[in-house]
């Protein structure tokens, strides 16, 4: 499959993320999380670090029209896609450590799916989620486990590091269940429980390898100062060198095992 022209533009990553990753990768996890929370009619839901909003959208589908659902993200690009896909949801730009919730109304449910690991101030973000949650409300936070536990992401990172040097991949940087549990306890949550969950998802191999390489370049020290031409050259080289990973696929698709910690708690 050929990627459209915008695939080389990092500014267009939100469209790529929604088009090729949300459905096969993030929706199954959002559905698992929403099921775990046991939503009930009338629940107000806050999705923190919502990206293009898949957790909020799954919640809205369960609760129906008229439900109070708010999604918050720091990325205007992600929110632009979210608004285009689901205009009925209240999307707000803001950071997790200073949630834009001026109305002060608490939420029955707070979700943070694969966002916590990116927050510069995790205790402040956890405290903000605690304040946003109504007494007795339910929290769900998920973070990928270390990529050392998942063969394909680990191998793709090692390929990229041959060209970029060591990469601190934030996506997998908060995989210790004990750290996650302690963070939530310190923030004042009750009944904290962290479980390891796994899902095998089916992804378009070429697209996944390319998007993963784009993300790794962006997280590398050198990638932050590359010119567009240099970024494209390095991207093409990493994609080329990652080709052996595609040999395990069927019809161009890869079965990718994903592992995540899923923490639940109450306010």
Predicted features along the sequence, with ranges:
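Conserved class I S-adenosyl-L-methionine
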Residues: 1-43, 54-58, 77-81, 85, ...
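A short SAM/SAH-binding and catalytic strip from SAM-dependent methyltransferases
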Residues: 109-122, 145
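Class I SAM-dependent methyltransferase SAM/SAH-binding core
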Residues: 44-100, 124
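Conserved catalytic/acceptor-binding region of the Class I
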Residues: 123-124, 138-204, 223-227
């Amino acid at each position: 499959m050929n990627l459209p022209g915008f695939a080389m533009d990092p500014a267009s990553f939100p469209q790529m993320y929604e088009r090729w990753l949300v459905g096969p990768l993030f929706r199954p996890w959002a559905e698992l999380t929403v099921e775990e929370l046991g939503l009930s009619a009338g629940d107000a839901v806050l999705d923190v670090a919502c990206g293009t909003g898949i957790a909020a959208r799954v919640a809205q589908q369960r609760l129906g029209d008229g439900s109070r659902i708010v999604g918050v993200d720091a990325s205007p690009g992600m929110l632009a896609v979210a608004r285009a896909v689901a205009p009925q949801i209240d999307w707000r730009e803001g950071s997790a450590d200073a949630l834009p919730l001026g109305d002060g109304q608490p939420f029955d449910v707070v979700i943070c799916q694969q966002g916590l690991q990116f927050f510069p101030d995790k205790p402040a973000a956890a405290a903000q989620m605690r304040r946003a949650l109504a007494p007795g409300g339910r929290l769900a936070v998920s973070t990928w486990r270390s990529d050392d536990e998942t063969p394909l992401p680990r191998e793709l990172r090692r390929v990229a590091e041959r060209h970029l040097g060591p990469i601190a991949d934030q996506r997998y940087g908060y995989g210790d269940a004990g750290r996650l549990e302690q963070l939530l306890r310190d923030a004042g949550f009750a009944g904290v429980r962290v479980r390891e969950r796994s899902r095998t998802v089916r992804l378009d191999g070429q697209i996944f390898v390319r998007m993963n390489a784009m993300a790794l370049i962006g997280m590398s020290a050198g990638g932050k100062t590359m010119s567009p031409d240099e970024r494209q050259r390095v991207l093409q080289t990493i994609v080329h060198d990652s080709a052996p990973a595609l040999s395990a696929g069927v019809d161009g698709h890869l079965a990718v095992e994903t592992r995540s910690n899923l923490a639940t708690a109450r306010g």
